[in-house]
Amino acid sequence: MLRGKRVAVTGHTSGIGKEIYEYCQFNGAEVRGYSRRSGFDMKDRNGDHIINDILRLDAEIVFNHAWYPRVQNKILKILHTQWKEKEKVIINTGSATCYYSIGASIYESDKAELRDYCIAKATDYPYKDKCRLHNVSMGWTNSAVLEGVEEGDYFIDPYEAALVLINLVMPQNYVMTEIVCNAKFKPMKNMVQLRDKATANVIRDMQLEVKQPWEE
């Protein structure tokens, strides 16, 4: 499934992205990771350097995992447009927050746009568009967004979350365009800390040091 394939993973140094990257490496893929540590900060150049490098790599499989305001959607849309005539796969890490709001509007609207784009383009595959798209709206995962929250059985393990995404690589006689992968829920009174801390972490990560073009 992965051996010998050219694979790109954004956000490959922690959480789900790290698990995807290591799984692909172990299974013989030619995998390239994109993160600040590898010189590909999503804040830089609105993600253009990442997109250009993935195009130069001519990746066959892209795990569009990392999020930054507007950039994750930009990566999806440009790669998809460029690859309409090629048998590629783009697997996006969305968020269940586009179904169950936590109050982080930019994050949630970005993730909803990611989902909606994949669903809208699904009717073109494969007769008009050979590039296959998937989106997984992922629930609470033990990752950076929950930093500071005590671990509990309501988290999805990052390795298990990675497998949900990786299993979409193999072509089937059907296409699972959108998947909602929920963690286990508890009564809302027990989820308040989780929700509030996640919201604070997302908002913190959205506080940009430099004003970006989409804010003007």
Regions of interest found by a model, annotated:
Residues L76-H80, Y117-A122, A162-L165:
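Short-chain dehydrogenase/reductase
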Residues E60-F63, I78-Q82, K86-G94, C131-H134:
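Conserved catalytic-site loops of classical short-chain dehydrogenases/reductases
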Residues V31-D53, W67-R70, K74:
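Adenosine-cofactor binding site in Rossmann-like domains, unifying the SAM/SAH pocket
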Residues Y125-T141, N173-E178:
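Conserved Rossmann-fold SDR core element
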Residues F63-V71, G94-T97:
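Conserved NAD(P)H cofactor-binding loop of Rossmann-fold oxidoreductase domains
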Residues K84-K128, G139-S143, E150:
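Catalytic loop of short-chain dehydrogenase/reductase
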Residues N135, E150-E216:
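C-terminal helical subdomain
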Residues V7-F26:
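N-terminal Rossmann NAD(P)H-binding glycine-rich loop of SDR-like oxidoreductase domains
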